[in-house]
Amino acid sequence: MISFEKRLIYIHIPKTGGYTLKKILNPYSPDQLNQVTNRYNESGLSMTDDRTKEDIFHPSVRFYKQHYSDVYEHFTKFAIVRNPWDRMISYMMWLNKGKFDNELFMTWLDLNTTGIFNSTEDVNQVSMLTDNTGKCDIDVMIKYSEFNKIMYFFEARGIDSSLITTKTNSVHKNHYTEYCQYGLKEKIEKVCKLDIDFFGFTYDGDCKETALWF
């Protein structure tokens, strides 16, 4: 989602609290939010990009560099990044209508991007943040585990963040480690290796420090 008024480009990685952020940014963006039904028969918040008129869920860095090259380098690009184990459990439970199914999830992960996940962008967050050269072209990253920090990021730019206490679309209430049993932990580690290597995430949630973290 882009805001010319606030000179921001938000890269919405799936299952990182993005629906809430899009609602907050909506008054400052020419993009149009749409309530649609996707192929999993779940309600999802898509947007119509104002410039291309494309109906799109998760435009990546590559999308904005291609279609907004005139402003891309001058705007602040930001994203929320989530622990891969936590994110994939949340993602798969959302796809399965909130139900945990270890055997089914193992099958999905075995299929990787040839099955229910469409692309590497679905399984590895860094793929949404890199350009065609493989460079991670983002200015600010906020950890999902520190989601409320987005309030300070927005407030510094004059954006009303009062909706931030109502993060939407959450499907699992227990800690992700309670689900990562019977091989799931190791399977997610293998499938999400790009994220784990790039961000330095460990299973317990720690990640390496970088100047990009807000």
Label the predicted regions.
Residues 1-214:
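Membrane-interface amphipathic segments in extracytoplasmic regions
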